[in-house]
């Protein structure tokens, strides 16, 4: 579990790189987040949810859970990016809710995207 939650706003969690693989944070070639992994960047009382980025220049496989929720009294949901520049396997969940505000944003950003109906990957 990684927890960057705060009373007045969520923090930032970067795994494998920064937003869209840009900036000075070194990028991973491959990133794997297991099904028992949980990442929180919630505003606990007030404020906006934080930012969580899961990135890889080649392949990202994400099976965990992310929350970047807005505060219980005020605030909007945060921003979550789960991206593999070439390939993305997304089998996890992201909760960007906000009881008193607007939902946050989820960015899934591989080079190509295929959406398949079903109950699982494989």
Q: For each predicted feature, which ranges?
A:
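Extracellular and secretory-pathway beta-repeat/beta-biased strand scaffolds
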Residues: 1-122
């Amino acid at each position: 579990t990684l927890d960057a939650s705060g009373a007045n706003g969520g923090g930032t969690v970067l795994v494998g790189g920064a937003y869209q693989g840009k900036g000075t944070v070194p990028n991973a070639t491959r990133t794997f987040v297991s099904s028992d992994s949980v990442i929180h960047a919630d505003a606990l009382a007030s404020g906006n949810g934080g930012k969580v980025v899961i990135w890889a220049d080649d392949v990202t496989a994400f099976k965990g859970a992310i929350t970047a929720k807005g505060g219980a009294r005020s605030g909007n949901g945060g921003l979550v990016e789960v991206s593999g520049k070439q390939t993305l396997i997304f089998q996890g969940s992201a909760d960007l809710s906000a009881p008193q505000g607007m939902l946050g944003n989820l960015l899934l950003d591989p080079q190509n995207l295929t959406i398949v109906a079903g109950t699982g990957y494989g």
